[in-house]
């Protein structure tokens, strides 16, 4: 479960970094 949540958190984080 922890691995799934990480991922989910990294997905939006990477999207925001790409926008910046």
UniProtKB/Swiss-Prot annotation:
Task: Report keywords, A-Z.
Answer: Aspartyl protease, Glycoprotein, Hydrolase, Protease, Secreted
Grouped into one coarse class, the protein's main location is secreted
**One Gene Ontology term, aspect cellular component:** extracellular region
A GO molecular-function annotation: aspartic-type endopeptidase activity
Q: Where in the cell is it found?
A: Secreted
Report the EC number(s), separated by commas if there are several: 3.4.23.-
GO terms (BP aspect): proteolysis
Entry PTM? Glycosylated.
Disulphides = none
At the top of the EC hierarchy, this enzyme's class is hydrolase
The signal peptide here is: none
Give the protein family. Belongs to the peptidase A1 family.
Under which name does UniProt file this protein?
A: Pregnancy-associated glycoprotein 57
Q: Which organism is it from?
A: Ovis aries
């Amino acid at each position: 479960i922890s691995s799934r949540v990480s991922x989910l958190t990294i997905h939006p984080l990477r999207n925001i970094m790409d926008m910046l």
